[in-house]
């Protein structure tokens, strides 16, 4: 796909509505089709686009839809679904989740991750800011900029990616990230939704305590080994 043609077509068919994020590594804009009035997100980031290209052919109700991917010389442009709703982070600004609400969100994320992990995709950045709840109450996992494909022949990750507090120890060069890396983040997420704090500061003391503790074990071998196992415990 020609870069000039791609950008010219976008400019001709879409108008800029708002900018959601803009820094040296990532720009995220909301565009609106000039004729149809439909909104979509244009994401520009420094990366290969390898995972987004796989997502383009993957449809799941709990994963943001990816429409098109263009790879430039040192960046990737992703056109994806615009989700009208709130992030879990925005919901937490108004109050904590009840146990059932937190379980429902994690169940939905496990459904999404089961499909992703089957394809070898590890998200590596599950956190409240990357989980949307749309107007119909549907949970959507977004932002795959830090995601990677699991490669069995590798001993560690090529690049250190993720968010401090939610990233598992192996994301910092100790081993290769795998499905258990995302399970670690789910444990932290549950604790934050229920207490407002990282488990190292305030560990949830209710019925989900043992589940959270198992998710966030430093040793991946002591965590749940799959999201299916986690769902069964929930």
Set out the residue ranges of the language-model regions.
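Catalytic-loop of the protein kinase fold
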Residues: 117-133
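Conserved short submotifs of the Hanks-type protein kinase catalytic core
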Residues: 73-87, 91
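Conserved HRD-motif arginine in the catalytic loop of eukaryotic-like protein kinases
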Residues: 223
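Conserved HxN/HPN-centered segment at the entrance to the catalytic loop
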Residues: 59-68
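ATP-binding glycine-rich loop module of kinase domains
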Residues: 13-53
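Conserved activation segment of eukaryotic-like protein kinases, specifically the C-terminal portion
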Residues: 157-170
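Activation segment signature within eukaryotic-like protein kinase domains
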Residues: 105-106
């Amino acid at each position: 796909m020609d870069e000039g043609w791609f950008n010219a077509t976008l400019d001709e068919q879409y108008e800029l509505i708002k900018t959601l994020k803009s820094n040296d590594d990532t720009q995220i804009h909301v565009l609106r089709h000039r004729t149809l009035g439909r909104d979509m997100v244009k994401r520009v980031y420094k990366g290969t686009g390898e995972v987004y290209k796989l997502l383009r052919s993957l449809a799941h109700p709990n994963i943001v839809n990816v429409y098109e991917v263009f790879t430039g010389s040192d960046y990737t442009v992703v056109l994806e679904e615009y989700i009208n709703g709130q992030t879990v982070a925005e919901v937490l600004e108004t109050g904590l989740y009840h146990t059932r609400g937190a379980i429902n969100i994690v169940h939905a994320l496990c459904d999404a991750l089961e499909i992703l992990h089957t394809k070898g995709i590890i998200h590596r950045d599950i956190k409240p800011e990357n989980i949307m709840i749309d107007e119909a109450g549907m949970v959507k996992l977004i932002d795959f900029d830090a995601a990677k494909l699991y490669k069995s022949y590798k001993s560690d990750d090529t690049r250190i990616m993720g968010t401090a507090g939610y990233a598992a120890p192996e994301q910092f060069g100790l081993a290769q990230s795998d499905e258990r890396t995302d399970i670690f983040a789910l444990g932290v997420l549950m604790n934050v939704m229920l207490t407002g704090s990282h488990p190292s500061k305030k560990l949830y003391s209710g019925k989900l305590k043992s589940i959270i503790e198992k998710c966030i074990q430093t040793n991946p071998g002591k965590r749940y080994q799959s999201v299916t196992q986690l769902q069964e415990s929930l």
